[in-house]
Amino acid sequence: ITTYNCKDGIKFSTVIQDESSKATPAELALPLVYGEKNIVIGDHRQLPPMLDKEEFINTLDFLIDNVTGESEMKQLRKLKTYVIKNFDEMEISHFQRIYESIDPSLKGKFTRQYRMHPDINEVIKQFYEEKDDNDSANGLICGLIDPIDLGVNDPDMSNPFSRYHGIQIDDFICGEALSANNHVIWIDVNSPEMIEGTSRVNEGEVNVISHILKKFSESDSFKQYCDKWADEDDKEIGIISFYSKQRNKIRRMCKSFNDLPLKIDVVDRFQGMERNIIIVSMVRSNTIISDSQQQPDYSEYELGFPEQHDLGFAQSPNRLNVALSRSKRLLIIIGNSELFRQKSIYDNVYNIIKANPNGKIIKCNPYEDICK
């Protein structure tokens, strides 16, 4: 790539932009004016520039509560209504719009990934299945085993292509074991969600995560696993939530596990990161409560609590893709299958894990099965 001066300023023969899906339109456009040729690289199936709906609406609510002029208040309320109604459209990155509209002769794509175990790859490859010119679907290929197996299950984790974890816990949760052959697990919980401001929390899922962390902290095989890594990022268990209030709840709970290396955040802030072990808290449920002390009432409600059917943030395929694709060796999903399987992308995830001989679907009542 050459750089040269001209009367209009600096010019480049070629400009390469990476992580372009996270760029705003201005950030994407500005470098283009300096290049004769432009190569824009990104993943149109991941999240756009960070735009936190909760923070956005909370800020608007603050302004509405503090503004003095009637005209300004009316405009802010109008903006809030627009954001709530059109947030899905706002979450489409400029890179995605360009990629989907540009002439096919001007674009290409990588179809192999080398991050994750093939069992995890199977779960996320649906997000990359697009019809080609022959009308046949294609998806994401795991380069660790295709065209040849590079040692993906090699117990020697110094092999850079190994995605073995070696953790063995006989009584992991609800009477089920975790073995070294397990790489994808869905823990199916039935606990209700609760509204906190503009956010959501699920106390039952926090209990499940606490139980899992306790099992890891007591496990000799997990300690041996950690000893194999010099880098703290490799040791860390990543915990991802779709909601900031749930993240905060998990962080408070995790103060009891200071001995464990943990990274806890919302899915948007995990984009671009990876960890060997990832736990995903889905939060949303098919039942909802208004108070954390609310008890089930089966005389009034079939499921004990009022029903709800909204997936909220979790309905975004790009957000789900980011959450599930952070893991290299072990992915644990904690969520209510009765709600999420109503949407095909989640039903696919569930069925892929269920059909995998080494996958696990574990039914769990977080108030009974793990809190006796």
Where are the regions that the model predicts?
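Conserved helicase motor "Helicase C" RecA-like lobe of SF1/SF2 P-loop NTPases
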Residues: 216-266
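Structural motif
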Residues: 16, 39-41, 186, 240, ...
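Helicase C-terminal subdomain and adjacent C-terminal extension
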Residues: 50, 54-108, 254, 287-372
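Conserved nucleotide-binding/hydrolysis micro-motifs of P-loop NTPases
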Residues: 2, 21-22, 44-48, 54-56, ...
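Metal-dependent catalytic core segments for phosphate chemistry
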Residues: 26-69, 159-207, 277-294
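Conserved RecA-like ASCE ATPase "motif II neighborhood" in helicase/translocase motors
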Residues: 1-30, 265-268, 282-283, 288-322
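ASCE P-loop NTPase helicase motor core
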Residues: 1-129, 354
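Helicase-core coupling region on the C-terminal RecA-like lobe
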Residues: 110-215, 273-275, 322-328, 332-372
